Amino acid sequence: QHYPLGDMDGEDPMGELEIPSKSFYRQNGEPYTGKVKASVTFLDPRNISTATAAQSDLNFINDEGDTFPLRTYGMFSVDFTDEAASESLNVGKVKVHLDSTQVKMPEHVPMMKLWSLNPDTGLWEEEGDFRFESQRRKRREDRTFLVGNMEIRERRLFNLDVPESRRCFIKVRAYRSERFLPSEQIQGVVVSVINLEPRAGFSSNPRAWGRFDSVLTGPNGACLPAFCDDQSPDAYSAYVLASLAGEELEAVESSPKFNPNAIGVPQPYLNKLKYRRTDHEDPRVKKTAFQISMAKPRPNSAEESNGPIYAFENLQACEEAPPSAAHFRFYQIEGDRYDYNTVPFNEDDPMSWTEDYLAWWPKPMEFRACYIKVKIVGPLEVNVRSRNMGGTHRQTVGKLYGIRDVKSTRDRDQPNVSSACLEFKCSGMLYDQDRVDRTLVKVIPQGSCHRASVNSMLHEYLVNHLPLAVNNDTSEYTMLAPLDPLGHNYGIYTVTDQDPRTAKEIALGRCFDGSSDGSSRVMKSNVGVALTFNCVERQVGRQSAFQYLQSTSARPSPASTVRGRAPSRRQRASSGSQRQPRGVASLRFPGVAQQPLSN
């Protein structure tokens, strides 16, 4: 049986998998001779849109124990099950054929190896070498293939890679606003770089991406590894983007204004790097990434010695560079995300934790992040809120821990479908470690929505772990959060780490991917879902709450007191502090106590 790898229009496959008959066997070692259900997924580096779907940075550890980068010629995962899809099958003899004509850099051919991703370490491990083999394909010319052998014993991601040595570092910082103040730098931002293959005229494929890397910003920004070239400044280019808890940050504009002071890099080096934000030629494109030429700094050039590109051997200089040194910038924009903690806590500073029964994170240095995946079926993206209150603990019952708002992410392939990975307060021991609290969590889509379904395994778990929350309102969902970490089969994602930012990023990656061990930067709406809501667009002309309050005819008299709570408003706040969006006035009503956003 032959399985092609790659299906680019107008292009031959990168290669194929060849599996001889009678190669399958069960988990206990017994041969399997029945029908096989096969699934082969290939990430084709010739398609730039597949780069963000890569599950791991491309790194391996060499014989000396040093971490080195890889350049990929494609990644693939395989899943073989029996006819009933009840048991995963192992495969004893598998051949991987790589078309040598697809390897555009001749020096890479003898260096090509087959790698597999270790899910525990996140590093790639060598599976074997390739050998040359000439084959005559049907109705085609003779081709030379690189052939490697492997055995599939567990579900892993495999890779066709070569080690690469021409490396540099890119200095990037993230800020809370366009003021770019050093005091407003953000830690815990995931900054990612996609290394594009050399441009036309250089000895490689100008359309392919070769590497994906991600780094978390610290108190002094981040240094991202990327390929570079000192002989030809245009040889390699890099595509850089940044996100915080699923929220994309914005890069500094390059058109119509091109301000080196705002970008963070002085001339003439900036022109040499050819900085372009993604909307440079089309203002309709998102503004959340930029592309540069990876021109390695010349050692005898003063204007290139102070960043933002550093030679590989100058990593320490990159990491210790002051904010005044050249660097690229991202910043937060006012959006549809809101975080509120009853007990304030700065996630950039774990030492700001205080003892309190209502602390969102009850145990310092052991931060447990919990997310639930919510699918929205409807024409618009929707803000989804979690309202988190004490549920079973005598000190916290009925009291608010905090609120989280996030906007659903549109599915790339399905119209009228979006999904949200929504944080909620984990159940468990409170700060005194005396007894547990089952957090009462309300999941509330902010729109005209109707609950369509609840994950059957999650529902069964909650029924079997009493008490069971009441769910009479079909526009929302209420649960006493599970004590167990559960997993993607339930639509619940839980990660514990010494750093709250790291715990949240790992949990978010799993939630986006819909798996308990993988990670994705692309939302996969149909897998690992806990709740599904059907949402419709509000009717045109329907009176809003603000219009109602402004209407004199809607109130019996000017002296009347407005009863109930103030209407919620869209806003976002950085973790550790709440701030109001620009240009929105604070609305206060007589006789109504001001509260955090709530339903």
From Swiss-Prot:
Residues that carry a glycan: N47, N416, N472
Tissue: Specifically expressed in cartilage. Expressed at lower level in young cartilage than in adult cartilage. In adult cartilage, it is highly expressed throughout middeep zones.
Keywords noted in UniProt: Extracellular matrix, Glycoprotein, Secreted
GO cellular component: extracellular region
Coiled-coil features, chain-numbered ranges: none
Major location category of this protein: secreted
Modifications made to the protein after synthesis: Cleaved into 2 chains possibly by a furin-like protease upon or preceding secretion.
Region (Disordered): 550-599
Polar residues bias (residue ranges): 550-560
Paired cysteines (S-S): none
InterPro entries per the UniProt record, alphabetical: CILP-1/2_8th, CILP-1/2_C, CILP1/CILP2
Induction notes from the record: Up-regulated upon TGFB1 treatment, and down-regulated by IGF1.
Keyword Metal-binding: no
Highest taxon in the source lineage: Eukaryota
Subcellular location: Secreted, Extracellular space, Extracellular matrix
Pfam families for this protein: CILP_8th (PF23730), CILP_C (PF23599)
Comp. bias (Low complexity): 573-583
Task performed by this protein: Probably plays a role in cartilage scaffolding. May act by antagonizing TGF-beta1 (TGFB1) and IGF1 functions. Has the ability to suppress IGF1-induced proliferation and sulfated proteoglycan synthesis, and inhibits ligand-induced IGF1R autophosphorylation. May inhibit TGFB1-mediated induction of cartilage matrix genes via its interaction with TGFB1. Overexpression may lead to impair chondrocyte growth and matrix repair and indirectly promote inorganic pyrophosphate (PPi) supersaturation in aging and osteoarthritis cartilage.
Oligomer status and interactors: Monomer. Interacts with TGFB1.
Protein name (record): Cartilage intermediate layer protein 1
Species, as recorded: Sus scrofa (Pig)
